[in-house]
């Protein structure tokens, strides 16, 4: 049995708007999983962002890679094991069967309100 590896992702990501900050809170901060297992990452907005939510993956020394936009639409070339769901204030990124290349940092970003 393979030793668990860690998925790390940002606890907090926020973008300000003209009426106040929208705070994006991700949980859990770390997730210990093994290849082949399912990983579920959550993101909560402090106010509704409709479906204007994106998920990114970042590996050391690389730029962030867009995985999901519109809360549930996979970007071009993203494998079907990645799926997004949710709307309003509650969102989820699911990786159905983790591959070794999936161990990375994951971010959610709202784009409903911009500075």
UniProtKB/Swiss-Prot annotation:
Residues 21-43 are annotated as: Framework-1. Residues 21-115 form the Ig-like domain. PROSITE patterns: IG_LIKE (PS50835). The keyword Heme does not apply. It is found in: Secreted; Cell membrane. InterPro entries: Ig-like_dom, Ig-like_dom_sf, Ig-like_fold, Ig_sub, Ig_V-set, IgV_Light_Chain. Residues 44-54 are annotated as: Complementarity-determining-1. GO terms for molecular function: antigen binding. GO terms for cellular component: blood microparticle; extracellular region; immunoglobulin complex; plasma membrane. Residues 109-115 are annotated as: Complementarity-determining-3. Residues 1-20 form the signal peptide. The keyword Disulfide bond applies. Residues 77-108 are annotated as: Framework-3. Immunoglobulins are composed of two identical heavy chains and two identical light chains; disulfide-linked. V region of the variable domain of immunoglobulin light chains that participates in the antigen recognition. Immunoglobulins, also known as antibodies, are membrane-bound or secreted glycoproteins produced by B lymphocytes. In the recognition phase of humoral immunity, the membrane-bound immunoglobulins serve as receptors which, upon binding of a specific antigen, trigger the clonal expansion and differentiation of B lymphocytes into immunoglobulins-secreting plasma cells. This is Immunoglobulin kappa variable 3-15. The lineage of its organism: Eukaryota, Metazoa, Chordata, Craniata, Vertebrata. The gene is IGKV3-15.
């Amino acid at each position: 049995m393979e030793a668990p590896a860690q998925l790390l992702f940002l606890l907090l990501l926020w973008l300000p708007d003209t009426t106040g900050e929208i705070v994006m809170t991700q949980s859990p901060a770390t997730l210990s999983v093994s290849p082949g297992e399912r990983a579920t990452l959550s993101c909560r907005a402090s106010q509704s962002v409709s479906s204007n939510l994106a998920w990114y993956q970042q590996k050391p020394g690389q730029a962030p890679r867009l995985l999901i936009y519109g809360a549930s639409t996979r970007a071009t070339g993203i494998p079907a094991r990645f799926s997004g769901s949710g709307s309003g204030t509650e969102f989820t990124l699911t990786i159905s069967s983790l591959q070794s290349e999936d161990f990375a940092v994951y971010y959610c970003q709202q784009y409903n309100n911009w500075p």
